């Protein structure tokens, strides 16, 4: 919130002691920024038990426009549609999060169908036409299929699923590696190249492979005179959130 602006908060709801908090309608207005929620139910531990509709239209702290909506189409099944979404802080939080400390945002398992015109990955890089779906079970994504475009020739895709042996398979392909790699400051001047990541996990044991092809590197930090496997391991650790081994670079 900007301390120099007036904020209006409109609430229509009620609270059941030691049970749920019900919002029939909740509206937050600040200049041209507005957030509208309908039929929002929060459980006793503040996790989301239900929401029928949510609309977001605001300029965030990075001066990026966010304009999207979430609509329930049937029980625990939602559509996320919109023109603009800034995912920069979300990506940073995911990369820095500890899975053991995962927050219980949702009370129930949900399906999220996504259709966003433009999504910013950081301050300058963005993707277009992000489409796909996520299946969230116990506040963890157990199934995913997302695709998007950098432009007409470059694309990015992300999947999570299970194979016949019940291994959790995660894949990430990006025909532009730079927007993902340059988040890690120990590598300087990274340019071009494409990225291919594969991970198989079962019983909390993960085997992963990260390939980055056809890239250019202008500068290395003093402590890494050559591009070592230790440095590569660092990228993979951040991508997966756990220790993994490199097969190829």
Descriptions of predicted regions:
Residues 1-249:
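Membrane-proximal interfacial segments on either side of biological membranes
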């Amino acid at each position: 919130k900007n301390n120099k602006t007036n904020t209006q908060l409109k609430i229509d709801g009620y609270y059941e002691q030691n049970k749920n908090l019900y919002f029939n309608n909740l509206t937050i207005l600040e200049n041209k920024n507005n957030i509208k929620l309908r039929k929002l139910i929060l459980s006793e531990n503040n996790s989301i038990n239900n929401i029928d509709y949510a609309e977001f239209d605001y300029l965030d702290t990075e001066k990026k426009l966010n304009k999207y909506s979430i609509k329930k189409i049937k029980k625990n099944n939602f559509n996320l549609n919109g023109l603009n979404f800034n995912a920069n802080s979300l990506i940073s939080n995911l990369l820095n999060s500890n899975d053991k400390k995962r927050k219980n945002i949702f009370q129930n398992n949900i399906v999220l169908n996504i259709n966003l015109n433009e999504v910013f990955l950081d301050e300058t890089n963005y993707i277009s036409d992000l489409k796909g779906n996520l299946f969230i079970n116990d506040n963890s994504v157990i199934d995913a299929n997302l695709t998007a475009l950098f432009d007409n020739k470059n694309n990015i895709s992300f999947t999570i699923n299970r194979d016949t042996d019940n291994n959790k398979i995660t894949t990430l392909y990006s025909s532009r590696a730079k927007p993902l790699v340059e988040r890690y400051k120990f590598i300087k001047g990274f340019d071009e190249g494409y990225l291919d990541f594969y991970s198989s996990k079962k019983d909390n044991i993960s085997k992963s492979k990260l390939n980055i092809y056809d890239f250019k590197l202008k500068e290395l930090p003093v402590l890494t005179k050559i591009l070592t496997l230790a440095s590569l391991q660092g990228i993979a650790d951040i991508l997966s959130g756990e220790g993994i081994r490199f097969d190829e670079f």
